[in-house]
Design a protein with these regions (language model features):
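Helix N-cap at the beta1-alpha1 junction of Rossmann-like dinucleotide-binding domains, i.e.
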Residues: 36-39
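Glycine-rich Rossmann-fold phosphate-binding loop(s) that bind the pyrophosphate
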Residues: 9-10
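N-terminal Rossmann-fold NAD(P) dinucleotide-binding loop
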Residues: 13-14
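Rossmann-fold cofactor-recognition segment
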Residues: 49-63
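N-terminal Rossmann-like NAD(P) cofactor-binding module of classical short-chain dehydrogenase/reductase
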Residues: 71, 77-81, 95, 102-103
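C-terminal catalytic/substrate-binding lobe primarily of soluble NAD(P)-dependent oxidoreductases
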Residues: 155-399
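Conserved Rossmann-fold cofactor-binding substructure of NAD(P)-dependent oxidoreductases
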Residues: 60-76, 83, 87
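Rossmann-fold NAD(P)-binding glycine/threonine-rich loop
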Residues: 106-133
């Protein structure tokens, strides 16, 4: 079918590369590019020899001319951005310059400000449209599959959706007193920020971890979950017509929250530079350096994740509730691709999103979120590539 360039070599990229190599009919050749080429080479060494040809390269994703030159040299059908969210705009610039479609899993966030929103990337819509290129935003699980679930529910189950609750439960145990399941810097910035939800056409802001609920998750059990701001709230509020409220909840254990509060209290989660022995350092980046690498958690992690969406709305004039979700087993993920389920649930949809664009099933000029395309081929692919979904027509609701 064609070629894909994957930028990044962390846990999510590792899963995506594994999945591309399982799908050689679509991904005939891939280029893995990262600032640290040795990580790319390690993936190539592990997976080389199959039907998917693998190349590697070193690149600084913030160096737009160098990145553009690399894209032009490889001539991929799509660039799959699995680097840091800070680098999204530079990679989009390079794709425009090289004339290549773009896919990512997380929206842009300025490095010096703990704030993420789609406005910066949506502003590229005219440029991608004029270039005849597709930019697919947020093709992970949340955002990503949660948007596809929403589009599927709207297409097949409802005449109108009024309420969406997105529930992200990680019931895994890695044995550490404190560690993050993906990039510590991004994770801690996300959970220490103020929460918010969309209601009646406006944002309602909350203090960090202010709103707590308890929910009994299938195959995981009862967990405490907390309302956070999450990026798909913004796109779903725009794209799911008639929605009155959208909320996002994520589960956290008491040990995690206790450690996080302690680190916040001593200033270790700050992104403001400080002077230390004549050098400028950012406390959060120092913390990231001493915490366990998320990529190392795979062999230690047991348990399951459960991520999904509870919908409330109308069908044929009657009230209706509907729940779509996926349960993923950490140990099974590690046995298959050498990564835990948090990376797996992001890396698989990343590959599927790239496949949707490469095959033309999802392709139109402009910048789009996943819920703006036909959900059916993506939903079918989830069942094929390791993230089978389940549904309930009588879910327990979140108050």
């Amino acid at each position: 079918m064609g070629k894909a360039m994957i930028i990044g070599a962390g846990g999510v990229a590792s899963v995506a590369v594994h999945k591309c190599c399982q799908n050689p009919e679509v991904f005939e050749e891939i280029l893995i590019a990262s600032r640290t080429k040795s990580k790319c080479d390690a993936l190539k060494e592990k997976l080389d020899g199959g039907r998917t040809k693998i190349r590697t390269a070193a690149v600084d994703a913030d160096d737009v001319p160098a990145l553009t030159a690399l894209i032009r040299d490889f001539q991929p059908d799509v660039v799959l951005n699995l680097a840091l969210p800070y680098q999204d705009l530079h990679i989009m610039d390079a794709c425009l310059a090289a004339g290549v479609h773009y896919v990512d899993t997380a929206n842009y966030e300025p490095e010096d400000t703990a704030k993420f929103e789609y406005s910066w990337q949506w502003a590229y819509a005219d440029r991608f449209r004029e270039a005849g290129l597709t930019a697919l935003l947020g093709s992970g699980f949340d955002p990503g599959v949660t948007g596809v679930f929403s589009a599927y529910a709207m297409k097949h189950e409802f005449d109108e959706i009024n309420y969406i609750d997105i529930l992200d439960c990680n019931g895994g145990d890695h044995g550490y007193p404190f560690a993050t399941n993906f990039n510590p810097e991004i994770n801690i910035r996300e959970v220490s920020a103020k929460g918010s939800y969309w209601e009646n056409g406006a944002w309602v802001e909350t203090e960090p971890m202010e709103i707590k609920r308890v929910y009994d998750f299938a195959e995981v059990g009862q967990k405490d979950m907390y309302l956070l701001h999450h990026e798909e709230l913004e796109s779903l509020a725009k794209n799911i017509k008639g929605v009155r409220r959208i909320r996002f909840f994520m589960t956290f254990g008491e040990s995690y929250l206790t450690h996080l509060r302690c680190l916040e209290n001593v200033g270790m989660t700050s992104i403001e530079p400080i002077d230390f022995e004549g050098h400028k350092i950012i406390p959060l980046q120092v913390l990231k350096a001493v915490l366990p690498d998320p990529a190392s958690l795979g062999p230690r992690t047991k348990g399951k994740t459960n991520i999904g969406c509870i919908f409330r709305g109308k069908k044929d004039g009657k009230d209706k509730n509907y729940y779509l979700y996926n349960v993923c087993d950490h140990e099974k993920c590690y046995a298959e691709v050498g990564s835990q389920a948090v990376a797996y649930t992001t890396g698989v949809p990343a590959m599927i999103g790239a496949m949707m664009v490469m095959t033309g099933k999802w392709r139109k000029p402009g910048v789009f979120n996943v819920e703006e395309f036909d959900p059916d081929p993506f939903m079918d692919a989830l069942n094929v590539w390791g993230l089978p979904w389940q549904e309930s027509h009588s879910p327990v609701l979140v108050d």
